[in-house]
């Protein structure tokens, strides 16, 4: 996002910098307590301290997971590009099932998911909330996925980095691992304060792995390739989860305003349609009716840098980041309109 980090995070960083010693960091008790308290207060999810494995980034966690779990990998497209590259980097086969889009509403295609799973599939990569389609998966959908994982004996790696960015007031984030003891046993949950509090450059994330055997496999896969977590990232994480509630509420209200303004503008252009964004600050825009060979290049030529849907497994779509000031958004919308009308 284009917003400054919360003042409490900046204060925590300044205090840590004033300390003056920047050796390797090791998580401290009050940091762990802030994570545990945050997960329980926000999501009703009570975890044990030993379940936490600290990471320098969430994408690192995706790649470690693919190394830690033997067998083929299953995911659903469109999806955040590292979901598609991590299995390849780990020498794992990747099976894809397309999500279904009905009247602009994205949902799971249970038949496609089952057909894409093979006897060799052992890992399911779940994006929750979903990047880029903006869904906050509800309890029924998650329980269906948990049943699917149990029936097919799958480990579920749930990327929940956008869990603090649910925009719809009637929606709430439900951690996959909180559904049941079986869901917890077969889960690796990846989280970070980076998206919600705009601190991705500080390099701090974590995995929550309740099962001891699975956790040991994950730790073994990290050996020798995953560095220590940035000590400044750890300090920022503690402050973000402990001291930034008011800032977070203001952020959500502002993002809702951006989303609603964006939806009106995009859906008002001929040949463009935007899916409703329940969570994240990312809009998923269908421009297939414009008939462009390369939509991202077309809009870039009109001064608007958008993520190419082809990278997510969905050519003809574009992703727009609306985590910005209203003035920047209005400028972007003007350029989007020019691009649409230039076809």
Role assignments for model-derived ranges:
Residues 238, 247, 253-263, 273-286:
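Conserved glycine-rich beta-strand-loop-beta hairpin in the small C-terminal domain of fold type I
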Residues 114-115, 183, 294-307, 312-343:
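PLP-dependent enzyme catalytic core of the Aspartate aminotransferase-like
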Residues 67-87:
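Conserved PLP-anchoring active-site segment centered on the Schiff-base-forming lysine
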Residues 90, 151-152, 183, 269, ...:
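Helix C-cap/helix->beta junction micro-motif
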Residues 101-170:
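Active-site phosphate-binding strand-loop segment of PLP-dependent enzymes
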Residues 180-256, 334:
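Conserved core segment of the aminotransferase class I/II
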Residues 1-57, 242-243, 342-343:
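N-terminal small-domain helix-loop-helix segment of the aminotransferase-like
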């Amino acid at each position: 996002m284009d917003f400054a980090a919360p003042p409490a995070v900046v204060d925590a960083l300044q205090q840590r910098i004033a300390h003056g010693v920047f050796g390797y960091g090791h998580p401290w008790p009050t940091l762990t307590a802030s994570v545990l308290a945050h997960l329980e207060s926000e999501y009703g999810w009570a975890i044990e301290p030993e379940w936490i494995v600290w990471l320098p980034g969430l994408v690192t966690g995706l790649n470690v997971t693919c190394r830690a779990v033997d067998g083929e990998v299953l995911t659903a497209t469109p999806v955040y590009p590292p979901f598609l590259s991590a299995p390849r980097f780990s020498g794992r086969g990747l099976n894809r099932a397309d999500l279904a889009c009905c009247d602009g509403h994205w949902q799971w295609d249970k038949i496609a998911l089952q057909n894409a799973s093979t006897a060799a599939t052992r890992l399911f990569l779940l994006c929750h909330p979903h990047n880029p389609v903006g869904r906050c998966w509800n309890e029924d959908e998650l329980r269906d996925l948990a049943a699917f994982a149990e029936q097919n004996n799958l480990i579920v790696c749930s990327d929940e980095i956008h869990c603090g960015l649910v925009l719809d007031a009637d929606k709430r984030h439900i951690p996959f691992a909180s559904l049941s003891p079986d869901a917890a046993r077969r889960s690796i949950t990846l989280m970070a304060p980076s998206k919600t509090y705009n601190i991705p450059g500080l390099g701090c994330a974590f995995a929550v792995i309740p099962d001891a055997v699975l956790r040991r496999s994950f730790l073994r896969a990290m050996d020798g390739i995953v560095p220590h977590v940035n000590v400044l990232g750890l300090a920022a994480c503690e402050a973000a989860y402990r001291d930034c509630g008011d800032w977070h509420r203001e952020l959500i209200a502002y993002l809702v305003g951006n989303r609603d303004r964006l939806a009106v503008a995009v859906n008002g252009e001929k040949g463009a349609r935007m899916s409703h964004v329940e969570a994240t600050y990312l809009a998923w825009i269908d421009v297939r009716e414009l008939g462009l060979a390369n939509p991202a290049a077309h809009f870039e030529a009109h001064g608007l840098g958008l993520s190419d849907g082809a990278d997510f497994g969905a050519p003809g779509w574009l992703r727009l980041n609306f985590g910005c000031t209203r003035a920047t958004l209005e400028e972007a919308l003007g350029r989007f309109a020019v691009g649409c009308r230039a076809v």
